Structures are given as structure tokens and as C-alpha cells.
Amino acid sequence: MFKNLKIIKLENRALLKIKGEDSKEFLQALVTNNINFISNEKSIYSALLSPQGKYLYDFFIFQDSKSNYLIIDCEKNSYQELIQKLNIYKLRSNVEINLLDRIDVYTVYGSDLIKFISNLKMTYQEGYTKNISDNLFFIDPRNKSLGLRVYSNNLSNEFKEIASGILSDWHYLRIKNNIPHPYIDLEKEKSFIIENNFEKINAIDFNKGCYIGQENTARQKYRGTAKRKLVTAEIIGKDVTNGEKIVFDNRAVGTIRSSSKDICLVSIRSEVYDKCKRDNIKIKINESELKFL
């Protein structure tokens, strides 16, 4: 029925259960997005920063529809660090943080996605959330083009009939839409999220009030102090490698981030990007050229 639809089981995810009467207030004071946006019909994407406003962790946050406790969907290889960091800030708050197991995470994407979403009687908008037969679904809050996230310990037959996808194809879709994968495209304790499209992917609420790193993040937005942009470029020639330096006018101006097939993400100085776009300039890197899209 849905030939142009793929499903991938995301093996690199971990789920944390946040419960206790202070859990919402606790997270609201820490993370970049607004916890009060979360409901049984709305999930969010957010980040935890250092006091200097630099990237530490990113995650999805949603609500268990039965008990109303919060669930954080984060990278599996850093969940223990994240728990430790959250516990440091917990102090006397009535909050419990535990690993939630026996639930698998999937992403569903493809050109038939809108029809499939309609079949589930869901609204095709970022963060829209629905619980169906004890399975939780939400449209990716970063960009609806990234697909449907599914949380289940027993997929229904309609999902089992979807063909398996390839993670590299999903990354191509991500890069095409200029969306960072933080553990590839950002450097922990070094990168600023304003310079890496976190506002564009709905991870920051500038009206919520204070959170860790808020002052520097707000300054970069309102005073225009951000120096770099994360942009998508076409690769003309041979493949490029994550971490390769970009030189323009005899000075280092940027770095290659994630790539897939003939496109990549590039962290580059804003004035260089603006000049290249304005004057239709390609940047040479080894045996290739980059054309900003």
C-alpha cells in the first residue's frame, strides 16, 4: 500500500524516564526548549548546554500518555553522562531519572509519508504526537520531512509491512534539509547551537526565560555575534571527509561536517558563505569543489 516508505530501527537511542512532582520545573530550568509545550499531542526537541552556552547534549522529550511522566530520547552512547549531569542539577527536587528499557525506537520516512500519516489520522506538523494501541508516534519536531518517530515494544502489522530503510539514505534526507546530527556535526563543549541551526530546527524557545547557557545563546541571536553558519553544499568531484578544513583566500574559513553521496554540511564563516552565494563562487577543497545550495 505504501511502496515509497521505509522504516529503520534506531539502535543508537536510549530512553530516560523523568518522573516526580518537580520534573517539569526541573527540566524547564535546564534545557533550551519550553517544557510547557509538551502534551499528549505535542513532543519537542531540545538541548542541554554548558553555562557558557556551548553544546553538551541533545534529545527529544515527550510525555507518557498514561502516567504523564516525561521521557527523554537521547544518544545511547552518552545516556549515562546525561543522567549524571541531570543528577548534579537535581539537588532537592522531587525528581527520579531512570533508564527505560524494552522499548524500541524507529523512524519512518519516504515520499508516501503524508499518506501514511493521514492513514494514522495524525496531523502532518512538527511535533504532533499520538498514542495508538500503546505505541507512541510523533512527527519529527526538527523538520517534518525527517519522518515519523515510533516508540514500541511490539510493532503493529502495518509497520511490519514497511520495507527496511538504509540509515545513509535518511542522513542524505537530513543533510539535504540542512539539519545537523549533533554527534557528527557539532563538537561537545565547543560548538554554539545558534551557529548550527538549532533555532531553525525548533530546539530553542527564546521566550521561556532562563536556562543553562541562555545568556550567551540570546546574545548571539539578538546582537548578531554568531560568526559561523551550518549550510548544505553540493560536492562536485571526489568525496570529502568530516573534519576537513576549508581554505578560501589563503585562510581557514570552515570545516566539512557530515556528508552523504553528493552533498555535505559545512560549518563556515558567515561572511564567506554570503560572498560565495552572492557571487556564485565555488570553493575548491583538494580534488573537489563545494557549491553552496
PLM regions: where:
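Acidic, proline/glycine-enriched N-terminal capping motif
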Residues: M1-D58, D64-S67
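Hydrophobic side chains in well-ordered alpha-helices
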Residues: F26-L27, L82-K85, K229
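Short, surface-exposed ligand-recognition loops at beta-strand->loop->(often short) alpha-helix junctions
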Residues: K17-S23, V108-D112, E234-T241
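Short amphipathic beta-strand starts and helix->beta connectors
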Residues: M1-K3, I44-D58, I88-L91, T129-F137, ...
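Anionic-ligand-binding alpha/beta catalytic cores of soluble enzymes and soluble regulatory domains
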Residues: N143-L230
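Glycine-centered loop/turn motifs
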Residues: E41-K42, L120-K130, D239-E244, R278-N280
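Glycine-rich, small/acidic residue-mixed loop/short-helix segments
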Residues: Y55, N196-N202, Q214, A218-L293
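Acidic, low-complexity central loop/insert segments
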Residues: K6-I8, A14-K17, F60-N177, F248, ...
